[in-house]
Design a protein with these regions (language model features):
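Short beta-strand-loop/turn "lid" adjacent to the catalytic site in phosphate-handling enzymes
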Residues: 59-114
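Conserved ATP-utilizing enzyme core subdomain
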Residues: 17-36, 41-42, 173-264, 334, ...
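Phosphate/ATP-binding catalytic cores across multiple sugar-kinase/actin-like superfamilies
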Residues: 73-81, 252-278, 331
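Glycine-rich phosphate-binding loops at beta-strand->alpha-helix junctions
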Residues: 99, 279-298
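N-terminal beta1-alpha1 ligand-phosphate binding loop
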Residues: 6-24, 289
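Phosphate-binding/catalytic loop of phosphoryl-transfer enzymes
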Residues: 2-9, 103-108, 115, 119, ...
Length: 358
């Protein structure tokens, strides 16, 4: 039995930082298994967070320079982690950081040069997992459902609450997935105005009350009316959501409380309309799963027919890095790692670009 030893790297839309997960992944009786052996979360400093946040507005030459700079930074973090923990690594599998995602224009771009990452880390690197799917007419997102299918297929629904909320589930023998809408991105935007990176356990949100005008404004967002397949990201958030939040005069607690209600309403609407069983399970990961107030509110909106399953903190925090590690293995094995039923592409694909260190 071959054990793949992979370092998965993930930087999400919430701009919290870089997640590193060193994983052993193997196949037993046609089922993929995993063990997360070592992890590290590197918080972005103020400068890096600002550069990533503003990268969407950079001129082309400056964006490409930052693409290389960030790739070198990723390589440095990976190499230091590998050396400090004395890890035996076959490949590094990196998502990069999405700066532009306009699949309707045939465009998706994740900064973090794979060649720079490979050179600095001194390890074979797989990255750029989205562009092939977009070239095949797909949304290039979400990508995590391949891991939901292969690792967590026993659950009826898999919900990830990162910067964006996305869900995947099995329907008529096919994996279906899409971005539901807002999650931590809106909450972090609100807390950063008072100098906090996030609302720990939803403590501030719990103290607030609903601002009905804000709730109605968020629920009216056109994205929620779009048909599947669909995906969204930071550009949509900046263009459509930030103006609504910034124009609302209210306390931080009320803004957070209302936003959490909005997130839970939209998630519950999607899950309840898709559930066909008397009792369904919803497997929840991503930073939102650590928000106790959000989890209590979501469970109340889904009861009694849907039960939340919340795994270990390690899996909550590193699931995406784990799944990108899996995607890198599948790419190296030339197996399917992006599903057309999820993205709307013309066919399934084995996506990702392989870089060798020089």
């Amino acid at each position: 039995m071959k054990i793949h030893k992979v370092l998965g790297l993930m930087s999400g839309t919430s701009l919290d930082g870089l997640d590193l997960a060193y994983c052993h992944i193997w196949k037993k009786l046609d089922r993929w298994k995993f063990e997360i052996k070592e992890t590290r979360a590197i918080s972005y400093d103020i400068d890096m967070r600002a550069r990533l946040k503003n990268s969407i507005d950079l001129p082309a030459d400056e964006l490409l320079i930052f693409h290389n700079t960030y790739g070198s930074w990723l390589g440095k973090q990976a190499r230091e982690f590998i050396e400090e923990k004395e890890l035996d690594v076959d490949i590094i599998s990196s998502h990069g950081h999405t700066t532009h995602h306009q699949p309707q224009q045939g465009l998706t771009f994740q900064i973090g040069s794979g060649q720079q990452l490979a050179n600095v880390s001194r390890h074979k690197t797989v990255c750029d997992f989205r562009s092939n799917d977009v070239a095949l007419g797909g949304e290039g997102a979400p990508l995590v459902p391949i891991g939901d299918l292969l690792f967590f297929g026993e659950y009826d629904f898999c919900l990830n609450l990162g910067g964006i909320a996305n869900v995947s589930y099995e329907y008529e023998g096919k994996r279906i997935a899409y971005d539901i809408g807002l999650a931590n991105m809106i909450l972090n935007h609100i807390t950063q105005k008072i100098g906090l990176s996030y609302d720990e356990n939803g403590k501030l949100a719990r103290k607030g009350s609903i601002n009905n005008d804000l709730l109605e404004g968020l629920n009216r967002l056109e994205y929620y009316k779009l048909p599947f397949p669909k995906s969204t990201g930071y550009e949509w958030f900046i263009e459509k959501v930030v103006p609504i939040i910034d124009a609302t005069v209210d306390t931080t607690e009320n803004l957070l409380h209302t936003s959490v209600h909005h997130i839970c309403e939209q998630v519950a609407l999607q899950i309840k309309t898709k559930s066909i069983k008397d009792q369904s399970t919803l497997f929840v990961t991503g930073g939102g799963a650590l928000n106790q107030f959000m989890m209590e509110l979501l469970q109340s909106k889904l009861a009694p027919t849907v039960s939340l399953v919340i795994p270990s903190k390690k899996l909550i925090e590193y699931k995406e890095a784990l799944i990108f590690a899996l995607m890198g293995i599948l790419r190296m094995e030339q197996e399917i790692n992006v599903l057309k039923t999820v993205t709307g592409a013309s066919k399934d694909s084995s996506s990702g670009v392989v870089y060798l260190p020089s």
